Amino acid sequence: EICEYFAQSGSFRTFKAAQSQLKELEKIGYIPVIENVSSENGYNYIVIVGPFENRSQTNNARENLRRLNMDSLEKRSCKKI
């Protein structure tokens, strides 16, 4: 199994709000993406940073985001080999 790790840095109701955070993350050197998701609570756009090779790199990124007052979640995507 091969896994990639990501940090979800925000959930937003509007694309414009997600884009604002994306631009902030680009300013500090990340290459974030916006994903359109369906949710029951109305948050339709998430901002994702990564992929990272391991949880340690993901945790470092999450700590950097925390210093910028951005909460984040760890996300993992695994594929069987």
PLM segments and residue spans:
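Extracytoplasmic
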Residues: 1-3, 13-81
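Conserved beta3-strand ATP-binding lysine motif
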Residues: 10
